[in-house]
C-alpha cells in the first residue's frame, strides 16, 4: 500500500473491556502512508490514514520525539522544541470501517533551529470508541523529517570496528558517524569490508542497509559465515563520504 507505515506498530497497552459493552471486542487494523515524509520548514505535507477493518476506530495524532539507536531501531522520546512547531490537522479522527482520511502536517520555522534535517514522528494512537470493548491500543508512526533551510553539510566518517563471534558466523559492526546536518541512507553496496590476509583479499562483505540521522552515530553490520581464521586486516571502504571525496578507507587489525 504505497509504503504503508507500521513503525512502532506496537504495543501497546492492554485495556479492559468497557463495562456494559454488548458486542465482542473490536479487532483493530490501521495503516498510514507514506512511511516517511520530508517537510521543508515552513511547509506542509499530507499523510493518508486508512481503517481497513469493519469496526470504527478513533485515532489521536500528535508529533513526538524520534531517534534511531546504534543498530538503527526506532525509538520514541520526549517531544523537543521543534515538535512544538509541528501541527497535525485533524488531530483526532473518528474513522469508519473500510474508510480513509487525509491528515495535514504543517511546520513553521523556529528562528533558532539549526539548518538541516530534524527527525520527528507523528504518532497515530487508537482510542476506545464509546461503548465498545477494545483488546489493545494500537500505535503506529509516520516519520516526519523537518528540513530547515540553510547550508547543507554532508560528512560521514568511519570511527571504529567491532568483531563478535555468534555461533557459526562472525559479526562485524562498523561505527559510522554522520557529522553532517542531513540524513544519510547507507545502501548495501555503499559500505564494503575486505578481509585481507597475507597480502590477498580473502573475502568481500557489504554492510546491511540503514539510515543515519543527521548529527548521530550508528553501527553498520556485516556478517561472515566462512572459514577464514587468524589475524587479518579488515579494509573498510565507504563510498561518497562527503562532496569531492569518492571513497574513504580505514584499515583495522583483527583476529577471527
Where are these regions (language model features)?
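Surface-exposed binding patches on compact interaction domains or structured appendages
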Residues: 23-34, 52-102, 187-202
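Beta-sheet-dominated interaction scaffolds and their linkers
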Residues: 23-56, 92, 155-167, 173
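Short, solvent-exposed loop/turn segments enriched in Ser/Thr/Gly
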Residues: 31, 40-46, 99-103, 113-121, ...
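Beta-strand-rich interaction surfaces with strong enrichment in secreted/lumenal proteins
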Residues: 35, 89-95, 161, 206-212, ...
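Short proline/glycine- and polar residue-rich coil/turn motifs
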Residues: 39, 93-101, 209-218, 244, ...
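Exposed aromatic-hydrophobic patches
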Residues: 46, 102-104, 219-225
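Short solvent-exposed strand-capping/beta-turn motif centered on an Asx-Ser/Thr pair
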Residues: 48-55, 66-68, 177-184, 227, ...
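Terminal connector regions
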Residues: 55, 62-66, 108-151, 227-256
Amino acid at each position: 500500500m504505497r509504503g504503508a507505515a507500521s513503525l512502532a506498530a506496537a504495543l501497546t497497552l492492554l485495556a479492559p473491556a468497557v463495562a456494559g459493552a454488548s458486542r465482542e471486542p473490536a479487532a483493530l487494523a490501521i495503516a498510514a502512508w507514506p512511511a516517511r515524509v520530508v517537510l521543508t520548514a515552513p511547509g506542509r505535507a499530507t499523510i493518508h490514514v486508512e481503517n481497513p477493518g469493519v469496526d470504527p476506530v478513533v485515532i489521536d495524532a500528535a508529533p513526538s520525539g524520534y531517534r534511531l539507536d546504534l543498530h538503527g531501531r526506532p525509538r520514541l522520546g520526549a517531544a523537543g522544541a521543534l515538535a512544538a512547531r509541528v501541527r497535525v490537522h485533524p488531530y483526532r479522527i473518528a474513522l469508519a470501517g473500510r474508510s480513509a482520511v487525509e491528515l495535514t502536517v504543517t511546520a513553521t520555522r523556529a528562528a533558532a533551529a539549526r539548518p538541516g534535517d530534524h527527525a520527528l514522528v507523528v504518532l497515530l494512537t487508537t482510542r476506545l470508541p464509546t461503548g465498545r470493548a477494545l483488546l489493545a491500543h494500537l500505535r503506529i508512526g509516520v516519520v516526519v523529517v523537518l528540513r530547515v533551510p540553510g547550508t547543507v553539510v554532508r560528512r560521514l566518517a568511519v570511527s571504529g570496528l567491532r568483531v563478535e563471534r555468534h555461533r557459526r558466523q562472525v559479526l562485524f559492526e562498523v561505527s559510522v558517524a554522520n557529522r553532517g546536518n542531513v540524513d544519510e541512507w547507507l545502501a548495501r553496496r555503499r559500505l564494503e569490508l575486505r578481509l585481507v590476509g597475507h597480502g590477498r583479499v580473502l573475502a568481500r562483505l557489504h554492510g546491511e542497509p540503514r539510515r543515519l540521522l543527521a548529527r548521530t552515530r550508528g553501527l553498520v553490520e556485516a556478517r561472515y559465515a566462512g572459514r577464514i581464521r587468524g589475524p587479518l586486516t579488515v579494509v573498510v571502504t565507504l563510498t561518497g563520504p562527503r562532496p569531492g571525496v569518492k571513497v574513504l578507507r580505514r584499515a583495522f587489525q583483527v583476529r577471527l
